[in-house]
A protein has these predicted regions:
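N-terminal Sec-pathway targeting helices
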Residues: 1-27
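Short hydrophobic alpha-helical membrane-anchoring segments
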Residues: 21-36, 173
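Aromatic-lined carbohydrate-recognition surfaces of secreted/lumenal glycan-active proteins
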Residues: 173-190
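Substrate-binding cleft of extracellular glycoside hydrolase catalytic domains
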Residues: 43, 51-74, 83-169, 173-175
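Substrate-binding cleft/loops of secretory-pathway carbohydrate-active enzymes
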Residues: 190-197
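A general secondary-structure junction signal
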Residues: 17, 146, 184-186
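Ser/Thr/Pro/Gly-rich low-complexity linker/stalk segments immediately outside membranes or between
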Residues: 32-54
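Residue-level detector of anion-binding/catalytic polar loops
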Residues: 79, 109, 179
């Protein structure tokens, strides 16, 4: 009698485990399959802007996306991409060199971006970026990604931030021979960047 009860226990746990595996696999693969289906049928996935309204489509990538298949991006209509290179004064993206190298062989225009850290000087951040990103013909201008990231509610000093950004902009423009692009959310733009117009 114990063996019969033990057999039911094994069956229940096996079925439960299989259901759990199917739920996890579904959570991972359903969004990917939906994206593939929508793209292959000519429809836009929900998080992609309509090509009628925005005919030029781009992307940004970092270590977070892993290895990039540039042919797939190109087949999805991506015509330009910014690759994360650096952050602050001493961080470089672990995938940058590989992404930069392999992207050069694709038909996608590429550029590099730097994640700005408010607590670091503009000069040191520019130096970090310039050490990692080579001066290369036919690449997009460098980008400085300026985002508020501290949840403490204490905002960085406006004038100090503007001074540091100006120093970084000047150094990057001098080094690469082109004006850098500033990327920011609307609130950050209004508070820290609108003065650069």
């Amino acid at each position: 009698m114990k063996r019969k009860h033990y057999g039911k226990y094994i069956v229940r746990w096996t079925v439960t485990l299989l259901l759990l595996v199917l739920i996890v696999a579904g959570a991972v693969w359903i969004p990917r399959l939906l994206h593939i289906f929508l793209t292959s049928t000519g429809r836009q996935p929900p998080d992609v802007p309509d090509t009628q309204d925005y005919p030029v489509q781009g992307a940004d990538v970092s270590y977070y996306q892993g290895n990039i298949d540039w042919n797939v991006l190109e087949s999805q209509g991506i015509s330009f991409c910014f690759i994360k290179a650096t952050e602050g004064i001493d961080h470089s993206d672990t995938q940058f060199r590989q992404n930069w190298s392999t992207a050069q062989d694709s038909g996608i225009y590429v550029g590099a971006y730097h994640f700005y850290r408010f607590e670091n000087s503009g000069r040191e951040q520019a130096e970090n970026f310039m050490q990692q990103v080579p001066v290369t013909e036919n690449t997009l201008p460098p980008v400085i990604d300026v985002e508020l990231y501290d949840d403490s509610g204490i905002l960085p000093d406006v004038q100090e931030t503007r001074d540091n950004l100006q120093e970084m902009l000047d150094l990057l423009e001098e080094h690469y021979g082109v004006k850098p692009i500033l990327y920011a959310a609307p609130n950050t733009y209004r508070k820290y960047i609108s003065c650069f117009q």
